[in-house]
Amino acid sequence: MASRIYADRKIVIITTFLVIGFIYLIRLFYIQVIDRSYTLSANNNVLRYVTQFPARGLIYDRNGKLLVYNEAVYDLMVIPRQVKDVDTAEICRLLGITAEGYHERMKKARDYSPMLASAFEKQISKETYGYIEEKLYRFRGFFVQPRTLRKYPMSIGAHLLGYIGEVTPVQVGKSDYYKQGDYIGISGIERAYEKELRGIKGLKIRMVDVFNRDVGSFENGRYDTSAVMGGDLYTGIDADLQQYGEKLMANKRGSIVAIDPATGEILCFLSSPGYDPNLLVGRVRGKNYGILNNDPIKPLLNRAIMGQYPPGSTFKMANDMVGLQMGVITKNTRYSCQGPGSSPIKCTHNHVSPLDVYMAIQQSCNPFHWQVFRAIMSDPNYENTKQRYDVWRKHLMSMGFGRKLNTDLAFELKGNLPPSEVFDKIYGVGRWNAMTIRSLSIGQGEVLTTPLQLVNYASMVANRGFFYPPHVVRSVGNEKNKTNFGNQKNVASINVEYIDIVIQGMREVFEGSHGTARAYKIDSLSMAGKTGTAQTSSGKDNSNFIAFAPVETPKIAICVIVEEAGFGSRWAAPIASLMIEKYLFHTVKRKEIEENMINANLLNN
């Protein structure tokens, strides 16, 4: 009986071992024959994992002109642990670096990781790459990795397009996508559309022999993944108009922004002084950035969305529209600008008095607009100045003042349209009134606007009461894949009938016998505009102008600001008029005006 039990146990034990052994054999077969990932691990010492960086998407203007493309460069990569018996003198000679530079780079690579590849020398030219490639087999642990850099064929739109640079450690820590040495959009639409532009990385596994020679792909590329190029961007920018605007603004400080009112697409976006965007590309970027950053005329400052200026007289129509909407004035209301009517804000133009809103806009009469503001701040339908001011401010914010417009450009500022609490804090609750803040009525004092806000305001008027967020990119990936800005209609709280009154006044700026921009009317084109002369903290005046055309079916709205250049009619108005002519007619006939604007140097004003 005992022997039988023993025999049964022996059978069970043997069977168990046989089953376990069979399982191990099956697993071993799977590992060695079917699942090659273990082979990858076993052969890690002779395999090289090379990231395939995708080309960033291209950027086009509204007519298909190429604004940004890619150019091939090469990074010399190093895996410190694999570096053996390297002729440092030879590699230093090929790269044009010192022995000290070699050791600094190697230390940085070891600190990053002895086992992983990192950039030893970045952005090697094609010529240098050719020399190195021939001798690369002599430098164990080194290999070349292709990259691309941005190129700007027309050398325009630096603030609009932006630039790319290396990711920071903070950005690496926050992302699963970026690794040390990767590039990322830093400003402009390169930053705003980074995810769309960057593409998807790929990976190639290459076999390398003991002489550091690439002997082919592992498993015929079975485990490789291809990089996917980033999506192209199709912008609303008119490259010819942009180039022309930059020519007009040469040797001047300021900004031009133009919009298609029907869509909100930005046609021209420039900040002056600007710079050639190619300066911030490649190995010279760091040096050039330092030069630009230290330049006293601030070429890196994006004045179009970060410059906050007093709007001056361009703001007067906004005040008029609020007065009309609140019912404190009508189109027939007249105010005098002589005698007591010229106090506390004097008139700076010679014209008939009293005058109505049409004449006041045409001739930019300060006292008229101050008295409109005083009427608003005395409206008997509200209990106090604070309530009246809050209503006034709410109307203005519906026009796009005092808030961000949610454009597709980074670092947009909102200007300044202070809430009533600010004046409570400055003057005391209940201790301020229209007289206290009278400068607001003519676009001075605390009110500040960006050029983007002013052109958006002109666009809102052109559309008779609404606007779409100003934006640069109209579609991503292909021209049919539109951005969603066209679904974001913003409606101002002003009735169309009151906007039409203001538009008629703006037409008279060009067409009236005393219009402040009558000298810059384009024949056979209906135009509406407003000059602005805004005093700055330096005591000098900025030259401001907003306009749109044609009045009946607006195709362009524009804002021009020329810093410390004097009257709006002297510089900003003619520049805006030339830009409108260029866009609508594709040529400019008024050569004398054009030459005067192009040749003027106002940087030393």
Model regions: which residues?
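Periplasmic/cell-envelope proteins involved in peptidoglycan metabolism and beta-lactam response
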Residues: 1-286, 308, 331, 388-398, ...
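Beta-lactam-recognizing serine transpeptidase/beta-lactamase-like catalytic domain environment
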Residues: 68, 209-214, 219-221, 262-314, ...
